[in-house]
């Protein structure tokens, strides 16, 4: 995609992903599989330098994505703030891990943040390259997670 338009294959994939939702919502079809994107339910400090994000389904994350010879790390796609202003602080994550429906963020600082954002920009930071990953996706359906902006981190 070019940041706005998809190729034929992209629109075909979009149709394949939306069909189960339309079938459920407009035609009362039942499904035995998860057909929705992962949605963040809770964010809390689970340790002195650890934040846990809990989603509504099992997830997986891409730890890195290489584009034009540059590695883009998932841990650099999260932003934090100390107050209710827009989160802008990044590069404070030592490592990430995921387990079932959770992402565990290990911080490299003792600072306590109030809010967190995972909202990839149209372009990678400080580039004109369209964002193409890394992603958070559903483990069983491979649908990209809903981004979240300025979510409170519970103590």
Q: Where are the language model's segments positioned?
A:
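A short glycine/threonine-centered beta-strand motif
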Residues: 47-76, 80-84, 107-109
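Mixed-charge, low-complexity segments
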Residues: 108-112, 133-155
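Histidine-centered active-site loop/cap adjacent to the catalytic His
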Residues: 2-54
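Short acidic/polar inter-strand loop motif in beta-rich domains
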Residues: 120-137
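Short, aromatic- and glycine-rich surface loops/edge beta-strands on solvent-exposed regions
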Residues: 113-120
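Aromatic- and glycine-rich beta-strand/loop motifs that create alpha-glucan
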Residues: 88
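A surface-exposed beta-strand-loop module
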Residues: 91-113
């Amino acid at each position: 995609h070019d940041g706005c338009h998809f190729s034929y294959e992209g629109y075909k994939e979009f149709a394949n992903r939306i069909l189960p939702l339309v079938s459920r919502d407009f035609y009362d079809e039942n499904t035995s599989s998860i057909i929705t994107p992962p949605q963040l339910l809770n964010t809390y400090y689970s340790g002195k330098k650890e934040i846990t994000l809990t989603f509504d389904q099992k997830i997986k994350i891409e730890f890195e994505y290489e584009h034009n010879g540059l590695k883009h790390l998932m841990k650099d796609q999260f932003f934090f703030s100390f107050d209710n202003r827009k989160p802008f602080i990044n590069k404070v994550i030592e490592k990430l891990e995921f387990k079932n429906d959770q992402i565990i963020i290990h911080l490299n600082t003792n600072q306590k943040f109030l809010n967190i954002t995972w909202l990839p920009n149209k372009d990678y930071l400080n580039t004109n390259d369209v964002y193409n990953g890394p992603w958070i996706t559903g483990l069983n359906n491979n649908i990209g997670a809903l981004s979240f902006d300025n979510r409170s981190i519970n103590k």
